[in-house]
């Protein structure tokens, strides 16, 4: 029995050693050099810095070690630290890349205007559409549509709740007892 355990342990060590040597020969994508950190602090792995924390797509793209937790009201990011407000306000673009040689980051942050990602089709920006009152439907129309949808759902739910009774003949022998 001890020989079997020794051979399994030896095989595992050889496999780990082979994997380590292969990992050392594969090129690693460029990441920012780790800064000396204080004892107990956690260095966040980021590829860029978002100009707005409300832009969830940008936060998810830029912060590589973020943990997303599903909550009833929203998807809340954990593991974020707040950058200085001056820097956040001064960013004219969606985000700023830490490495100029990261093509995916450059495409995401600089070539695609982030206001167009949330814009109402056919308008310049969401704010302009609401200020001009040129939304696709007025508030009254939306309210009416919601009422119709709600009434339809209530009607459908009531139809589903009605028990289906089997029709019995009136001359059943069980009733005559």
Swiss-Prot record:
The residues the entry assigns to the signal sequence are: 1-23
Any idea which UniProt keywords this protein has?
Cleavage on pair of basic residues, Disulfide bond, Secreted, Signal, Vasoactive, Vasoconstrictor
Disulfide topology: 48-62, 50-58
What does UniProt give as GO cellular component? extracellular space
The subcellular localization recorded is:
Secreted
BP term (GO), one: intracellular calcium ion homeostasis
Q: Where is this region: Disordered?
A: 155-177
Pfam families reported in the protein's UniProt record? Endothelin
Where this protein primarily resides, as one coarse class? secreted
Report a single Gene Ontology molecular function: endothelin B receptor binding
The keyword Secreted belongs to this UniProt entry's keyword annotation: yes
Cite the SMART domains for this sequence: END (SM00272)
Region described as Endothelin-like? 95-110
InterPro entries for the chain? Endothelin, Endothelin_toxin_CS, Endothln-like_toxin
Query: Which residue numbers mark the site Cleavage?
Result: 68-69
* Distribution of this protein across tissues and organs: Expressed in various organs including heart, lung, liver, kidney, gastrointestinal tract, uterus and ovary, but not in spleen. Within the gastrointestinal tract, gene expression was detected in rumen, a ruminant-specific digestive organ, as well as stomach, duodenum and colon.
Q: Which residues form the propeptide?
A: 24-45, 69-177
Q: Which domain of life is it from?
A: Eukaryota
Q: What does this protein do?
A: Endothelins are endothelium-derived vasoconstrictor peptides.
Tell me which family the UniProt entry assigns to this protein: Belongs to the endothelin/sarafotoxin family.
Which protein is depicted?
A: Endothelin-2
* Native source organism of the sequence: Bos taurus
Instruction: State which gene encodes it.
Output: EDN2
